[in-house]
Amino acid sequence: MRWHHLPMLLILITAAVIAVGGTIRIYDAGESCPDWPLCFGKLGFDVSADEQAAWWAENPDEIDSRGENHRYTTFQIFTEWFHRLLAGSILGPLVILQFLIVRKKNPSLSIESKRLATLSLALVIWQGFIGFVTVKWDNEHWSVALHLFSALIFTLSLIALDISWRRDRGHNLKIETVNKTMNRLSIATVGSLVVLLVGTFVSTTEGANQACGVSGIPYSWPLCSGTLGLFIQDLLIQSQAIHRWLVLIVLCILAWLWWTRFDWAPDERIRKLSNIATWTFISNMALGAAYVITWTSESGFIEWLSVIHLLLASLTFLIFSSSLILIHLHGINNNEEE
């Protein structure tokens, strides 16, 4: 078997785990398995309303945040169960297998690849722990944000291993850089991450997605309740206004980076990756606007737009971060003075 394809397979599985996690959020199913690692004390997901009531009666300290009489549908429980199945029963064992293969079966691999395999194993264990914390803390904003951040860092460890493994097999890219290259990409990476994490608070805080109103253009977008959204009284409830201002700031930074791209990115491949990430960011801005302005009194928000919004935001961060990894592993600095 061509084991060097394993990191890419794990990246795809991780993307599926993140997507299912987003689905859990839009269906309000984050607490549909109140215990961990089981679901209402069962291995399966088919838990009736009566069985849920019996479990709550036996576990009075685990009251659902929506009240003791709240019940979940089979589909809601399935989304959380499937999320755990992908992460714990498929992704986790494959990461362990990858670690064993890299450490024991491939002596020709570099020490860097072996360290990355170890890091990915440590991170998937950490991610499982954070998943447990998220359940125990009833999907608090900070725990959900930390869970997503950890998933992205884990994904980056797999991307880095994939690139390093390919380099060990002779795929040397020789990417030209200058002293400005890492600096500029780091700014874009941090900016996209901050926007993503604040967006997580918007999506997990009750009422935050309506904090700027639902009256369409221009009252609710691009304005925030008919104002510029500068007066902040409640950081969580008004996180949408903060999110929008951060998006605008990062957009200006990305426009500046695009305008000066030949100054800081001599390698065409890095410029292309930066351009792809920038256009992904801009497209996601439009998607975020569409999410707000398509609200109706009959059906509310189109929540699938929210999931795609999350995935595109994650993709933007991962593309910028992957550019940094490529430069770290394949970069050739021309030693230009800034």
Regions of interest found by a model, annotated:
Residues M1-E338:
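Polytopic transmembrane helical bundles with strong interfacial aromatic enrichment
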